[in-house]
Amino acid sequence: IVGGVSVAIE
């Protein structure tokens, strides 16, 4: 997931 805080779990 790119474009948010969720980028940390990529």
UniProtKB/Swiss-Prot annotation:
Regulation: Activated by Mg(2+) and Fe(2+) ions. Inhibited by Cu(2+) ions and EDTA. Activity is unaffected by Ca(2+), Ba(2+), Zn(2+), K(+) and Mn(2+) ions.
Family: Belongs to the peptidase S1 family.
The protein's role, per its UniProt record: Hydrolyzes fibrin.
GO cellular component: extracellular region
Top-level EC class as recorded in UniProt: hydrolase
Keyword flag Secreted: yes
Activity as a function of temperature: Optimum temperature is 25 degrees Celsius. Active between 15 and 45 degrees Celsius, however activity rapidly decreases after 1 hour incubation at temperatures above 40 degrees Celsius.
EC number(s) recorded for this UniProt protein: 3.4.-.-
Lineage: Eukaryota, Fungi, Dikarya, Ascomycota, Pezizomycotina
GO biological process: proteolysis
Reported pH dependence: Optimum pH is 6.0. Active from pH 5.0 to 8.0 at 37 degrees Celsius, above pH 8.0 stability decreases rapidly.
Keywords: Hydrolase, Protease, Secreted
Single GO term (MF): peptidase activity
Name by which UniProt lists this protein: Fibrinolytic enzyme
Keyword Protease: yes
Recorded superkingdom: Eukaryota
Location(s), subcellular: Secreted, Extracellular space
